A protein has these predicted regions:
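ATP/adenylate-binding site constellation spanning eukaryotic-like Ser/Thr protein kinases
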Residues: 62, 72, 90, 203, ...
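Extracytoplasmic/periplasmic regions of membrane proteins
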Residues: 118, 229, 239-242, 257-260, ...
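Residues that scaffold the ATP/ADP-binding catalytic core of kinase and kinase-like folds
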Residues: 68, 142, 215, 284, ...
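Structural motif corresponding to alpha-helix initiation and N-cap regions
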Residues: 41, 105, 123, 134, ...
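Alpha-helix N-cap/helix-start and coil->helix boundary motif
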Residues: 8, 65, 91, 188, ...
Length: 299
């Protein structure tokens, strides 16, 4: 399990991460979302020991990353697919990591096969790799030590639709086998499809966290009648706050039973009475981070 407690990082007078607390549970995929500059990458860098925290803790199974004796055997990390030795081949990069971790040489070919890098591609210099190939190599390196935790920052960048689906299936299977995945991505649809839990950060602070079903759950009631004006007056008389929907009908936070009772007492015939649809991830994300967004920036 990943545990972040009261984590703070300041640079002079600027606070990049401000009292952040969250967990990423075993056997689950946790989506870590936020606009550009919200503190996602800084949090992940602190978690894997690349940036010191000003205050607070970030641990993996109760230990700091820097205290792990052979971290690659316990935690797989991919923060920047372009941060690879451009003059080495993909196979050489994996071989160096394999020897550092004390793994059998066969593990290199196993990982190349897993991420679908051919022998020809594996023997090319990384400077000649596309971004998608670098992402696959980064995933291979992260999984090389058979870790039980994965920490990934934008791992789908540069992947085509087939590659994104491959990534999704890979991470879903990894979590289902008992692994812990902390995943940062600006591809909100992919996060919505794969994540079990969500953590949303804005201006360095957590603005929402919980299971995906909790955060995207439906709230309130949608109701229509043959006379929505009269229905609105009846709801107002019953002290039930409500709003008129742009596409017709009324939305209220009251439950369906209560709304139905009010309509019955007013002698109104309802043509629709249902729980409100849950918000999509994009809608929820934009609403929660509205104060931190720049025009045209989604994550």
């Amino acid at each position: 399990m990943i545990s972040v407690e009261s984590l703070t990082k300041t640079y002079g007078g600027f606070t990049a991460v401000d009292d952040v607390t969250f967990t990423a549970a075993t056997g689950r995929v946790t989506g870590f979302l936020g606009p550009n500059g919200a503190g996602k990458s800084t949090t992940l860098r602190i978690l894997v020991g690349l940036t010191p925290a000003t205050a607070g803790t970030a641990t993996i199974d109760g230990r700091r990353f820097t205290d792990l004796p052979n971290p690659g055997r316990e935690v797989g990390v991919l923060l920047d697919a372009s941060a690879q030795h451009a003059g080495r081949t993909g196979r050489e990069i994996l071989t160096v990591a394999q020897r550092t971790m004390g793994l059998p040489t066969s593990r290199v070919q196993e990982m190349l096969d897993l991420v679908s890098l051919t022998d020809d591609e594996a023997d090319r210099r990384v400077r000649n790799y596309s971004l998608g190939m670098r992402q696959r190599l980064g995933i291979a390196t992260a999984l090389l030590g058979d870790p039980h935790v994965l920490i990934l920052d934008e791992p789908a960048n540069g992947l085509d639709p087939a590659g994104i689906r491959w990534m999704r299936d890979l991470l879903r299977g990894y979590a289902d086998r008992g692994g812990t995945v902390l995943l940062s991505s600006h591809l909100l649809h992919e996060i919505e499809v794969i994540a079990d839990d969500l953590v949303v950060i804005g201006n360095g602070r957590i603005v929402a966290q919980g299971t995906k079903s909790e955060l995207l759950a439906s709230v309130g009631t949608v109701v229509r009648s043959r006379d929505d004006v009269a229905l609105g007056r009846a709801l107002q008389a019953a002290d039930i706050d409500h709003t008129v929907r742009p596409d017709g009908g009324i939305h209220t936070d009251a439950g369906t039973d209560r709304v139905g009772e009010v309509a019955l007492a007013a002698g109104l015939v309802l043509t629709e009475l249902r729980h409100a649809d849950g918000a999509g991830l994009e809608e929820m994300f934009l609403e929660l981070t509205a104060d931190t967004q720049r025009e045209g920036v989604a994550a």
